[in-house]
Amino acid sequence: MEFTKLSNRLDLVASFVPAGARLLDVGSDHAYLPIALLQEGKIEAAIAGEVVEGPYQSALQNVADNGLEDKIEVRLANGLAAFEPADGISCITIAGMGGRLIADILAAGLEKLANVSRLVLQPNNREDELRAWLVDHDFHIVDEAILVENEKFYESLVVEQGSQELTAKELRFGPYLMREQAPAFVQKWSKEVEKLAFALEQVPVENQSARASLEERISQIKEVLHVSK
Protein backbone atom coordinates (compact mmCIF):
# COMPACT_ATOMS: atom_id res chain seq x y z
CA MET A 1 0.00 0.00 0.00
CA GLU A 2 1.33 3.43 -0.93
CA PHE A 3 1.11 5.83 1.98
CA THR A 4 -0.57 9.20 1.48
CA LYS A 5 1.89 12.09 1.51
CA LEU A 6 0.49 15.21 3.13
CA SER A 7 1.43 18.78 2.32
CA ASN A 8 3.46 20.51 5.02
CA ARG A 9 0.45 22.47 6.25
CA LEU A 10 -1.74 19.36 6.58
CA ASP A 11 1.14 17.49 8.17
CA LEU A 12 1.20 20.22 10.81
CA VAL A 13 -2.52 19.72 11.44
CA ALA A 14 -1.99 15.96 11.67
CA SER A 15 0.73 16.41 14.29
CA PHE A 16 -1.81 17.92 16.70
CA VAL A 17 -4.41 15.14 16.37
CA PRO A 18 -4.26 12.97 19.52
CA ALA A 19 -3.37 9.30 19.21
CA GLY A 20 -6.43 7.06 19.27
CA ALA A 21 -8.80 9.85 18.29
CA ARG A 22 -12.09 9.44 16.50
CA LEU A 23 -11.76 12.25 13.98
CA LEU A 24 -14.11 14.50 12.06
CA ASP A 25 -12.33 16.32 9.24
CA VAL A 26 -14.55 19.18 8.04
CA GLY A 27 -14.08 20.16 4.40
CA SER A 28 -12.03 17.02 3.91
CA ASP A 29 -11.63 17.49 0.14
CA HIS A 30 -9.91 14.27 -1.00
CA ALA A 31 -9.88 12.86 2.57
CA TYR A 32 -6.09 13.07 2.52
CA LEU A 33 -5.79 13.90 6.22
CA PRO A 34 -7.89 11.04 7.68
CA ILE A 35 -6.40 8.57 5.19
CA ALA A 36 -2.84 9.51 6.19
CA LEU A 37 -3.65 9.37 9.91
CA LEU A 38 -5.21 5.93 9.59
CA GLN A 39 -2.33 4.64 7.49
CA GLU A 40 0.00 5.74 10.28
CA GLY A 41 -2.19 3.96 12.82
CA LYS A 42 -2.57 7.18 14.76
CA ILE A 43 -6.38 7.38 14.89
CA GLU A 44 -9.13 4.86 15.50
CA ALA A 45 -11.65 5.98 12.88
CA ALA A 46 -12.76 9.07 10.98
CA ILE A 47 -15.59 10.89 9.31
CA ALA A 48 -14.65 12.94 6.26
CA GLY A 49 -17.21 15.71 5.82
CA GLU A 50 -17.72 17.52 2.52
CA VAL A 51 -20.42 19.97 1.50
CA VAL A 52 -19.59 20.00 -2.25
CA GLU A 53 -20.49 17.05 -4.47
CA GLY A 54 -17.23 16.94 -6.46
CA PRO A 55 -14.84 16.78 -3.48
CA TYR A 56 -17.27 14.39 -1.76
CA GLN A 57 -17.00 11.96 -4.69
CA SER A 58 -13.20 12.39 -4.73
CA ALA A 59 -13.06 11.55 -1.02
CA LEU A 60 -15.23 8.46 -1.53
CA GLN A 61 -12.94 7.27 -4.32
CA ASN A 62 -9.77 7.93 -2.35
CA VAL A 63 -11.05 6.07 0.70
CA ALA A 64 -12.04 3.11 -1.48
CA ASP A 65 -8.71 3.13 -3.35
CA ASN A 66 -6.92 2.87 0.00
CA GLY A 67 -9.19 0.12 1.31
CA LEU A 68 -10.33 2.16 4.29
CA GLU A 69 -14.11 2.03 3.89
CA ASP A 70 -14.41 0.25 7.25
CA LYS A 71 -12.53 3.05 9.03
CA ILE A 72 -13.49 6.26 7.20
CA GLU A 73 -17.08 7.26 6.52
CA VAL A 74 -17.45 10.02 3.94
CA ARG A 75 -20.54 12.16 4.50
CA LEU A 76 -22.07 14.87 2.32
CA ALA A 77 -22.96 17.48 4.91
CA ASN A 78 -22.41 21.10 5.87
CA GLY A 79 -19.88 21.64 8.67
CA LEU A 80 -20.66 19.93 11.95
CA ALA A 81 -23.86 18.46 10.51
CA ALA A 82 -21.53 15.67 9.35
CA PHE A 83 -21.58 14.05 12.79
CA GLU A 84 -23.88 13.16 15.67
CA PRO A 85 -22.99 12.64 19.35
CA ALA A 86 -23.41 8.87 18.86
CA ASP A 87 -20.39 8.93 16.50
CA GLY A 88 -18.13 9.49 19.50
CA ILE A 89 -16.01 12.12 17.78
CA SER A 90 -13.16 13.26 20.04
CA CYS A 91 -11.23 15.56 17.68
CA ILE A 92 -12.33 17.88 14.88
CA THR A 93 -10.00 19.33 12.25
CA ILE A 94 -10.92 22.28 10.04
CA ALA A 95 -8.33 23.63 7.59
CA GLY A 96 -8.22 25.62 4.38
CA MET A 97 -10.96 28.10 5.27
CA GLY A 98 -11.11 31.65 6.56
CA GLY A 99 -11.25 32.31 10.28
CA ARG A 100 -14.71 33.83 10.10
CA LEU A 101 -16.10 30.81 8.23
CA ILE A 102 -14.53 28.41 10.74
CA ALA A 103 -16.15 30.39 13.56
CA ASP A 104 -19.51 30.25 11.75
CA ILE A 105 -19.17 26.46 11.33
CA LEU A 106 -18.42 26.01 15.02
CA ALA A 107 -21.24 28.35 16.04
CA ALA A 108 -23.77 26.47 13.91
CA GLY A 109 -22.96 23.20 15.70
CA LEU A 110 -21.94 24.56 19.09
CA GLU A 111 -24.21 22.24 21.09
CA LYS A 112 -22.45 19.22 19.54
CA LEU A 113 -19.01 20.21 20.80
CA ALA A 114 -19.51 19.44 24.51
CA ASN A 115 -17.90 16.00 24.28
CA VAL A 116 -15.26 16.87 21.68
CA SER A 117 -11.96 17.14 23.54
CA ARG A 118 -9.87 18.88 20.86
CA LEU A 119 -10.24 21.15 17.84
CA VAL A 120 -7.34 21.64 15.44
CA LEU A 121 -8.06 24.72 13.35
CA GLN A 122 -5.99 26.16 10.51
CA PRO A 123 -7.57 29.39 9.23
CA ASN A 124 -6.08 30.99 6.13
CA ASN A 125 -7.09 34.52 7.22
CA ARG A 126 -8.83 36.43 10.05
CA GLU A 127 -7.06 34.42 12.73
CA ASP A 128 -7.78 37.18 15.26
CA GLU A 129 -11.53 36.92 14.70
CA LEU A 130 -11.41 33.16 15.22
CA ARG A 131 -9.43 33.53 18.45
CA ALA A 132 -11.95 36.10 19.70
CA TRP A 133 -14.86 33.76 18.94
CA LEU A 134 -13.15 30.88 20.74
CA VAL A 135 -12.51 32.96 23.86
CA ASP A 136 -16.10 34.26 23.84
CA HIS A 137 -17.42 30.68 23.76
CA ASP A 138 -15.29 29.20 26.55
CA PHE A 139 -12.63 27.51 24.46
CA HIS A 140 -8.98 27.53 25.42
CA ILE A 141 -6.06 27.73 22.98
CA VAL A 142 -3.46 25.26 24.29
CA ASP A 143 -0.91 25.50 21.48
CA GLU A 144 -0.22 27.23 18.18
CA ALA A 145 2.17 26.82 15.28
CA ILE A 146 2.88 28.65 12.05
CA LEU A 147 4.48 27.72 8.75
CA VAL A 148 4.85 29.14 5.29
CA GLU A 149 3.93 27.08 2.23
CA ASN A 150 3.85 28.36 -1.34
CA GLU A 151 4.49 31.88 -0.03
CA LYS A 152 1.36 31.78 2.16
CA PHE A 153 1.38 31.73 5.94
CA TYR A 154 -0.72 29.22 7.86
CA GLU A 155 -1.40 29.44 11.58
CA SER A 156 -2.66 26.33 13.38
CA LEU A 157 -4.63 26.64 16.62
CA VAL A 158 -4.96 23.72 19.03
CA VAL A 159 -8.11 24.24 21.06
CA GLU A 160 -9.67 22.48 24.04
CA GLN A 161 -12.59 23.09 26.40
CA GLY A 162 -12.13 25.73 29.10
CA SER A 163 -12.24 29.47 29.56
CA GLN A 164 -9.34 31.76 28.69
CA GLU A 165 -8.68 35.47 28.65
CA LEU A 166 -6.54 36.98 25.90
CA THR A 167 -5.37 40.54 25.44
CA ALA A 168 -6.05 42.41 22.20
CA LYS A 169 -2.42 41.81 21.27
CA GLU A 170 -2.69 38.06 21.94
CA LEU A 171 -5.86 37.87 19.84
CA ARG A 172 -4.05 39.50 16.92
CA PHE A 173 -0.70 37.73 17.09
CA GLY A 174 -1.50 34.52 18.97
CA PRO A 175 -0.45 33.96 22.61
CA TYR A 176 1.95 31.11 21.80
CA LEU A 177 3.15 32.42 18.45
CA MET A 178 4.18 35.81 19.79
CA ARG A 179 6.03 34.15 22.66
CA GLU A 180 7.86 31.57 20.53
CA GLN A 181 8.80 33.94 17.68
CA ALA A 182 9.25 31.17 15.10
CA PRO A 183 11.00 32.24 11.87
CA ALA A 184 7.72 32.04 9.90
CA PHE A 185 6.02 34.28 12.48
CA VAL A 186 8.78 36.88 12.22
CA GLN A 187 8.65 36.65 8.42
CA LYS A 188 4.87 37.09 8.32
CA TRP A 189 4.78 40.18 10.49
CA SER A 190 7.91 41.71 8.97
CA LYS A 191 6.14 41.54 5.61
CA GLU A 192 3.10 43.19 7.20
CA VAL A 193 5.31 46.04 8.46
CA GLU A 194 6.60 46.53 4.91
CA LYS A 195 3.03 46.69 3.54
CA LEU A 196 1.91 49.14 6.20
CA ALA A 197 5.01 51.31 5.72
CA PHE A 198 4.31 51.48 1.99
CA ALA A 199 0.68 52.40 2.70
CA LEU A 200 1.87 55.11 5.10
CA GLU A 201 4.01 56.65 2.36
CA GLN A 202 0.88 57.07 0.22
CA VAL A 203 -1.08 58.96 2.90
CA PRO A 204 -0.83 62.77 2.68
CA VAL A 205 0.89 64.45 5.64
CA GLU A 206 -2.26 66.46 6.38
CA ASN A 207 -4.29 63.27 6.94
CA GLN A 208 -3.01 62.88 10.47
CA SER A 209 -5.64 60.43 11.71
CA ALA A 210 -4.95 57.88 8.95
CA ARG A 211 -1.20 58.26 9.42
CA ALA A 212 -1.48 57.85 13.18
CA SER A 213 -3.51 54.67 12.76
CA LEU A 214 -0.93 53.13 10.42
CA GLU A 215 1.95 54.25 12.62
CA GLU A 216 0.30 52.66 15.65
CA ARG A 217 -0.14 49.34 13.82
CA ILE A 218 3.49 49.38 12.70
CA SER A 219 4.64 50.24 16.21
CA GLN A 220 2.65 47.38 17.74
CA ILE A 221 4.13 44.82 15.34
CA LYS A 222 7.67 46.09 15.95
CA GLU A 223 7.06 45.88 19.69
CA VAL A 224 5.94 42.25 19.37
CA LEU A 225 8.94 41.42 17.16
CA HIS A 226 11.28 43.26 19.57
CA VAL A 227 12.43 45.51 16.74
CA SER A 228 13.73 48.95 17.64
CA LYS A 229 12.09 51.88 15.87
Q: Where are the regions that the model predicts?
A:
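Conserved SAM-binding loop of SAM-dependent methyltransferases across substrates and taxa
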Residues: 30-43
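Conserved SAM-binding motif I beta-strand of class I
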Residues: 45-50
